């Protein structure tokens, strides 16, 4: 399930809620995303994110040096991010 926090239109206000840039409404970041979702680049949706454990910690193999990362890490500026098919 994709969440509001997985959308480029989500603007965080604090640790639990934010504003939808489309509807201008306050929303909870963990609620299900709407059909208008514009998927934000994150490690969890990158083909270079591998070997994730049950806690969402995996390995990035898309950069010069492999390293452990959280699946929820924003990857907007990551040069190695490639969306999964």
Curated annotation (Swiss-Prot):
Protein name as it appears in the record: 4-hydroxyphenylacetate decarboxylase small subunit
Regions annotated as coiled coil: none
Modulation of this protein's activity: Enzyme activity catalyzed by the HPA decarboxylase complex is rapidly and irreversibly inactivated by oxygen. Competitively inhibited by p-hydroxyphenylacetamide. Not inhibited by m- or o-hydroxyphenyl-acetate, p-hydroxybenzoate or p-hydroxyphenylpropionate.
Entry's EC annotation: 4.1.1.83
UniProt similarity note: Belongs to the HPA decarboxylase small subunit family.
pH dependence: Optimum pH is 7.0.
Cofactor(s) needed for function: [4Fe-4S] cluster
Gene Ontology molecular function: any one: 4-hydroxyphenylacetate decarboxylase activity
Record carries keyword Transport: no
Organism of provenance: Clostridioides difficile (Peptoclostridium difficile)
Temperature dependence of activity: Has a half-life of 15 minutes at 30 degrees Celsius.
Reaction(s) catalysed by this chain's protein: 4-hydroxyphenylacetate + H(+) = 4-methylphenol + CO2; 3,4-dihydroxyphenylacetate + H(+) = 4-methylcatechol + CO2; 2-hydroxy-2-(4-hydroxyphenyl)acetate + H(+) = 4-hydroxybenzyl alcohol + CO2
Binding site for [4Fe-4S] cluster 1: 4, 7, 20, 34
Pfam families noted in UniProt: 4HPAD_g_N (PF18671), HPIP_like (PF18524)
Cofactor note: Binds 2 [4Fe-4S] clusters per subunit.
Disulphides: none
Residues bound to [4Fe-4S] cluster 2: 43, 46, 60, 78
InterPro entries: 4HPAD_g_N, HPA_decarboxylase_ss_sf, HpdC_C
Keyword tags: 4Fe-4S, Iron, Iron-sulfur, Lyase, Metal-binding
Subunit relationships: Heterooctamer consisting of 4 large (HpdB) subunits and 4 small (HpdC) subunits.
Function: Component of the HPA decarboxylase that decarboxylates phenylacetates with a hydroxyl group in the p-position. Active toward 4-hydroxyphenylacetate, 3,4-dihydroxyphenylacetate and to a lesser extent p-hydroxymandelate (2-hydroxy-2-(4-hydroxyphenyl)acetate), forming 4-methylphenol, 4-methylcatechol and 4-hydroxybenzylalcohol, respectively. Is likely involved in the catabolism of aromatic amino acids such as tyrosine fermentation.
């Amino acid at each position: 399930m994709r969440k509001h926090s997985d959308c480029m239109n989500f603007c965080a206000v604090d640790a639990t809620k934010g504003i939808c840039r489309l509807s201008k409404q306050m929303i909870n970041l963990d609620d299900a995303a709407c059909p208008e979702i514009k998927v934000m680049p994150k490690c969890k949706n990158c083909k270079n994110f591998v070997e994730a454990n049950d806690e969402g910690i995996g390995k990035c193999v898309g950069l010069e040096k492999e390293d452990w990362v959280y699946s929820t890490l924003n990857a907007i500026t990551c040069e190695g991010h490639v969306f999964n098919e």
